[in-house]
From Swiss-Prot:
Sequence positions that bind Mg(2+): D89
Binding site for xanthine: D92, I135
Protein's organism: Escherichia coli O7:K1 (strain IAI39 / ExPEC)
Name of this chain's protein: Xanthine-guanine phosphoribosyltransferase
Gene name, Swiss-Prot/TrEMBL: gpt
Primary site of residence: membrane
């Protein structure tokens, strides 16, 4: 990745509120499925803004900090996604998005950020990001990048 795009907590909340406004009325949704780990914080923000209490996760591993690696489903939410919003922070090359679409064909799949290769795979997103740009999310940073304590 040649460029970095730094996301601050306040910008993330602004983007999540914008996305939530597009998902109104909230009564049309049974719940939210957050893609772990990138979709956990955006999922919590959407749940708050939409007043949704039913929140589940699908746990998919496809990144090892700066590098993409093989996709692995660790845990999935039940059902085909009907009436659910599936949220991730980013759609990049589309590997995770394809898996999400296969698992939850009836879900409404949204992200905060979208790169060109993955854009056609989501129903909605807020911010366009160039394909060669790495996104630094606020939960991954202190003043400088701070690796997770577990090393994973």
């Amino acid at each position: 990745m040649s460029e970095k795009y730094i996301v601050t907590w306040d910008r993330l909340q602004i983007h999540a509120r914008k996305l939530a406004s597009r998902l109104m009325p909230s009564e049309q949704w049974k719940g939210i499925i957050a893609v772990s780990r990138g979709g956990l914080v955006p999922g919590a923000l959407l749940a708050r803004e939409l007043g949704i209490r039913h929140v589940d996760t699908v746990c998919i591993s496809s990144y090892d900090h700066d590098n993409q690696r093989e996709l692995k489903v660790l845990k999935r939410a039940e059902g085909d996604g009907e009436g659910f919003i599936v949220i991730d922070d980013l759609v990049d090359t589309g590997g995770t998005a394809v898996a999400i679409r296969e698992m939850y064909p009836k879900a409404h799949f949204v992200t905060i950020f979208a790169k060109p290769a993955g854009r056609p795979l989501v129903d909605d997103y807020v911010v366009d990001i160039p394909q060669d740009t790495w996104i630094e999310q606020p939960w991954d940073m202190g003043v400088v990048f701070v690796p997770p304590i577990s090393g994973r």
